UniProtKB/Swiss-Prot annotation:
Belongs to the PsbJ family. Keywords: Chloroplast, Membrane, Photosynthesis, Photosystem II, Plastid, Reaction center, Thylakoid, Transmembrane, Transmembrane helix. It comes from Thalassiosira pseudonana (Marine diatom). This is Photosystem II reaction center protein J. Its main location: plastid. The keyword Plastid applies.
Length: 39
């Protein structure tokens, strides 16, 4: 296990989870807007 300094593990998980949710929401929004424009 590598010690990344004084950054707590919950903060890393929170930032990672927020990034995943943002990417997924952008993908869903892009596919939804693309589907609407194609129709």
């Amino acid at each position: 296990m590598v010690n990344t300094g004084r950054v707590p593990l919950w903060l890393v998980g929170l930032v990672g989870g927020f990034a995943v949710i943002t990417i997924v929401s952008l993908f869903i929004y892009g596919s939804y807007s693309g589907l609407g424009s194609s129709l």
